[in-house]
A protein has these predicted regions:
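Active-site entrance/lid segments in N-terminal catalytic domains of soluble metabolic enzymes
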Residues: 1-187
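Conserved active-site-proximal phosphate/metal-binding subdomains
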Residues: 161-193, 198-261
C-alpha cells in the first residue's frame, strides 16, 4: 500500500496483533525507508516485512505513451491542467536493496517483477526471506527459478496495482484468486500467500482451503486508524462502489474506485 496508507504504526499494529506487518518502500527515498524500518524494530520484537517495486527491464513504448497522452489531452484541457512529460526512474532500487540487507526484516516481497537470483542469494545471506508477487503460472515459475521462498498469488479481486510482469493472455482483468490458487497449488511446490479481496475471516478460510498457506490483507486495512490513508480516500472506501482497472498515474494496470467515465 505504497503512496501513504503504509506506515510504521500500521506495520507495528499488525505484527503486534499476530500478523506479519509490512512496510511499503514504494514512492519514498531509501533514507526514509530505513527510518521506518528502524521505527518498527524499536516498537516491537515481532517479525515484519517490507515490499519493494522491481524496476522494469523493458523501456516503455514511445508510440503507446504518445497515444495515451493524446487520449488524455481533451480531459486535461477540460480540467485546465497541463500534461506532464513521462518520467522513468527505478524508485531507488539499489539503495533500497542495501537498506533491506542492512536492516534485515524477516521478509522482502517484490512487486512488478522478479529479482535476479543474485539478489535473492544476497537476501538469504542477510537472513531475509524473498517473496515474489505473481498473477499467473509463468510468473510463479520465474519466482521459483530464482530461489524465492514463497509466492504471493495476487488474484484479480485485488485493489491497487496488478503485480504481474509476464503477459499470459488473460488481459488486465486477470485471474480470480481462488482459481489462481488452485492452478498454482498444482503447478508449483512453493508456499502460497493469497492476496486480493480478502477482507474477513470467511475469505481467509476460503483461500486456505484453496491451497494458500496464508492470506494477505491490503485495502481492508486502509481504514485502520494507524494507516496513513488521506481523508478523501477514507470517505470513498467507506462507501463501496464500482471499481475499474486503469493505467492512470503510473501506466501500470491498477484497480481503483470508479469516479466516473
Amino acid at each position: 500500500m505504497a503512496g501513504g496508507p503504509s506506515t510504521s504504526a500500521l506495520a507495528i499494529a499488525v505484527s503486534e496483533a499476530g500478523g506479519l506487518g509490512f512496510l511499503a518502500a514504494g514512492y519514498k527515498g531509501a533514507d526514509a525507508f530505513a527510518e521506518e524500518i528502524r521505527a518498527v524494530r524499536a516498537a516491537t520484537d515481532r517479525a515484519f516485512g517490507v515490499n519493494l517495486f522491481v524496476p522494469g527491464i523493458e523501456p516503455a513504448d514511445p508510440e503507446s505513451l504518445g497515444e495515451y497522452l493524446r487520449r488524455l489531452a481533451p480531459e486535461a484541457e477540460r480540467q485546465g491542467a497541463e500534461l506532464g512529460e513521462p518520467r522513468f526512474e527505478d524508485d531507488d532500487w539499489a539503495a533500497k536493496l542495501d537498506v533491506v540487507c542492512a536492516e534485515h526484516p524477516a521478509v522482502a516481497s517484490f512487486t512488478f517483477g522478479c529479482p535476479d537470483a543474485s539478489i535473492v542469494d544476497r537476501l538469504h545471506e542477510a537472513d531475509v526471506a524473498a517473496w515474489v508477487t505473481v498473477t499467473n503460472v509463468a510468473e510463479a515459475a520465474a519466482a521459483e527459478a530464482v530461489g524465492a521462498d514463497a509466492i504471493v498469488a495476487q488474484g484479480a479481486e485485488a485493489g491497487g496495482h496488478r503485480g504481474g510482469f509476464v503477459a499470459d493472455g488473460s488481459g488486465e482483468e486477470g485471474i480470480g484468486l481462488l482459481a489462481l490458487l488452485r492452478i498454482l497449488a498444482r503447478a508449483r511446490p512453493l508456499p502460497l500467500v493469497a492476496t486480493g479481496g480478502i477482507a474477513d475471516g470467511a475469505a481467509l478460510a476460503a483461500v486456505l482451503c484453496a491451497g494458500a498457506s496464508a492470506g494477505q490483507i491490503g485495502t481492508a486495512l486502509m481504514l485502520a486508524p494507524e494507516a496513513g490513508t488521506p481523508d478523501a480516500q477514507r470517505a470513498r472506501l467507506a462507501e463501496p462502489g464500482p471499481t475499474r482497472v486503469t493505467r492512470a498515474f503510473t501506466a501500470a494496470p491498477r484497480a481503483g474506485s470508479s469516479t466516473g467515465s
